[in-house]
From Swiss-Prot:
Name of the featured protein: Glycerol-3-phosphate dehydrogenase [NAD(P)+]
Gene3D superfamilies referenced in this protein's UniProt entry, alphabetically: N-(1-d-carboxylethyl)-l-norvaline Dehydrogenase, domain 2, NAD(P)-binding Rossmann-like Domain
Main localisation: cytoplasm
Matches recorded under NCBIfam families: PRK00094.1-2, PRK00094.1-4
UniProt similarity note: Belongs to the NAD-dependent glycerol-3-phosphate dehydrogenase family.
């Protein structure tokens, strides 16, 4: 099989490495020439996955047309804000019958579309049925190291979900299939906002009780939004919902949790992301998820609080107080 991964960041490189490790011929594309040169010459990506050797069947190209030539599987692994321009550039070189796996997590700010909705907005209608989402508790570094991981692959066509599942399945990477694209996407992007809240809680020393409450109530508001968009609520109890949320809220590898800890220490989100050297999607998604919730009439108090901390200068401690002092209500 020939596969193309658009995006050579940590997640794109980890998935490209996984596919190449199965013996597939894989080409990574990116706009960062230095990263591509490192992959091509040294079979490494020291910027995003330092110290890890990449398979020799992983190649690199900075030309979209060349990278997609003969591709039987396309993985879209760019940051959420880059999905639309990259798909616009790539669409002439992708053909019907080729599965397109979107692993970007986000809600586009201007349109409030999920990533697959953005892709469908750009691609010709005959390509829409071949679109799939891969999401779940999966840090790139651990996947690249071959540590056991389970994820969800969602597609509207069961045949496409199964095809993508088979392409990615290894002895250390286990995909489950689903038909709930919306649920997987909403779970995958809004959990990053809740993870910022978890980082704030941890950074301010609020303890295990607060963390458990944040994860539980965070899942509740994620589920409300997903269901309003047509998702199956059970999806949010699975890998692409609860699984991804728990991982992102609890691990030091989480960039979004790191942002929250930095905010608790008095840093700005911009300064924290410069230190990280990578995108923390929850910063953008706090704004777009809030706007989507307002449009759909969904109550999302944690998302609202994080938005106010990031964009209105609300002190983290005041945000916690505001959440705790909301009008009392039944849990369910």
């Amino acid at each position: 099989m020939r596969a193309t991964v658009l995006g050579a960041g940590s997640w794109g490189t980890a998935l490209a490495s996984l596919l190449a490790g199965k013996g597939y011929t894989v080409t990574s594309w990116d706009k960062d020439a230095a990263v591509l040169d490192d992959i091509a010459r040294n079979h490494r990506n020291e910027r995003y996955l330092p110290g890890l050797q990449l398979p020799p069947t992983l190649h690199a190209s900075g030309e979209v047309a060349k990278a997609l030539e003969g591709a039987e599987l396309v993985v879209l692994a760019v940051p959420s804000h880059a999905v639309r321009p990259v798909v616009i550039e790539a669409k002439r070189h992708v053909h019907a019958g080729t599965p397109i796996v979107c692993v970007a997590k986000g809600i586009e700010l201007d349109t409030l579309m999920t990533m697959t909705e953005v892709v469908e907005d750009v691609l010709p209608v005959p390509l829409h049925p071949y679109l799939a989402v891969l999401s779940g508790p999966s840090f790139a570094k651990e996947v690249a190291k071959g540590l056991p991981t389970a994820v969800t692959v969602a597609a509207r066509w069961e045949r496409i979900a199964k095809q993508v599942q088979d392409a990615f399945h290894t002895k250390t990477f286990r995909p489950y299939t689903s038909g709930d694209v919306v649920g997987c996407e909403v779970g995958g992007c809004v959990k990053n906002v809740v993870a910022i809240a978890a980082g704030i809680s941890d950074g301010m020393g609020f303890g295990a009780n607060a963390m458990a409450a944040l994860v539980t109530r965070g899942l509740a508001e994620i589920t409300r939004l997903a269901v309003r968009k047509g998702a199956n609520p059970l999806t949010l109890s699975g890998l692409a919902g609860l699984g991804d949320l728990v991982l992102t809220c609890s691990s030091d590898l989480s960039r979004n949790r790191t942002v929250g800890r930095g905010l608790a220490a008095g840093k700005t989100a911009d300064a924290i992301q410069r230190e990280l050297g990578q995108v923390a999607e929850g910063v953008r998604n706090a704004r777009s998820a809030r706007e989507l919730a307002k449009r759909l009439g969904v109550d999302m108090p944690i998302t609202e609080a994080i938005y106010r901390v990031l964009y209105e200068g609300l002190a983290p401690r005041e945000a916690v107080t505001a959440l705790m002092m909301r009008e009392t209500k039944p849990e369910l």
